[in-house]
Amino acid sequence: MKFKKLEKRFSIVYNEAGTMQSFALEKLGALMSEFVSYPLNFVLEKDLTKELLERDNIAIIGTPDNSQIIKELWQNGIVDIPDDNQGYFIKYGKSPFCEDAFALICASKSEKGVMYGIVDLINEYFSDTMCTTARSAITDPGFFDVGFVEPTPEFEKKSAPAIKDRAVWTWGHCIYDYKRFFENMILMRLSSVVIWTDFVPINAKEMVDHAHSLGISVFFGFSWAWDNRALDFDVTKDESLEMWTKKIVCRYENEFLPTGADGIYFQSFTETKNDSIDGVIIAELVTKWVNTISSKLFEKYPSLKLQFGLHATSVKNKLEYISKVDPRIRIVWEDCGSFPYHYNPKNVDGFEETLDFTDKILTLRGENDSFGAVLKGMPTLCWSTFEHQRGAYMIGTQSREFVEKRSLEKRRMWKYIQAYWLENAQYAQKIIALMADKSKGQAFVQMLIEDGMLEDKIMFPSALCALMMWEPTTDKDTLLRKAAASKVVYMA
């Protein structure tokens, strides 16, 4: 069967911009090259002519600050750019430049938004309605159209994230290829990473710089007396607190500050089901520790972003103490009950209690509490073979062969996790929607992928969770379809 083909070829109009918009341009070019059989023409906006606008279909991306065309389209009401700097407006249809041509437009107030817009275009529009190549023998007009080659449905979308900070929580030695890891984060429109590490990687600054070039914030995590049982000191003694305060301030200044990271994540002695240590209430003691140590850091670095990783198991019945944690510190809650806080996505027993507890802690320190949470139900470390790092290491530089081999080893775990995310997605969605609503979008939500080989493939459960962070009020079945249909997502 012959298809009706577009009479005009596409040219991509671009401007010299930063790494994020360059990433978007690269991905757009790669996408279009999957469909067309001709070499794509890239044209600097300053070199654009009236003749080319009439001759070709046009794809253009940018912001009002770096593109005069985008600015004029925005001022004339042709594109509707969201106020949110992570938001974007994407449109595919009849060209505003020539009545018998087509145009693809992606506009935002920031380069990050442009990047997210192109990612969304790839994941949603070209996954739902397109075939992967114009030369595919299985192309069927009853299912697919061929993008950029034949007329396809007009498309328009204005979008911004419901949750501003969407992150991955992981261990440093479980990032095997940091460049691919961060790229796959961007393909899920994630904005931050929290990296727990025993030692600072020797290439930490290079890694942080690369993350920043893609608009990803980096928080390094380390112990503030996380496991006092394995260490020879008594957390109830003031001299222990004084010793740890000096140690932490010194470690931050000498090790983590030079990396250029955006902040610090820490855990103390709350990862236990007991609510007291040697007769002292853990919630009261940890609040004293956290406030004392952080005050010393804030004295010298008042704009430092601190995240307190708090396990609810030891403090859930003593929240009156936790409410006194310095409001400048973001409390990042975990182990708050059933899935999506539970490691096993099968475990949804007691969900209503978990939902009620989440509702309570969201505004524990007031209506504008600096709230965060770690959601689980993804691959974890294998604790039966785990060893702590013994010294400095190089992060994320393993070979492609290593990554592919280890990824195959993780496939069985992903299959189990995928099955229960499919069955219990509504529970995760309810929690995430509550966080987005009650925090007015200011929650810092992290999904724990401790050893899931994100640098190799974006697996369905992580893509679904990321999608929920962006648009938690979309109905569950639509979210499931979007995640499953995405060009970049793999099913186990």
Please name every model-derived segment:
Residues M1-Y176, R180-L187:
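Solvent-exposed alpha-helical segments and adjacent loops
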Residues Y14, M491-A492:
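Acidic, low-complexity N-terminal propeptides/linkers enriched in Ser/Thr/Asp/Gly that mediate export
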Residues T49, D145-V146, E150, W169-H173, ...:
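Catalytic-core regions of glycoside hydrolase
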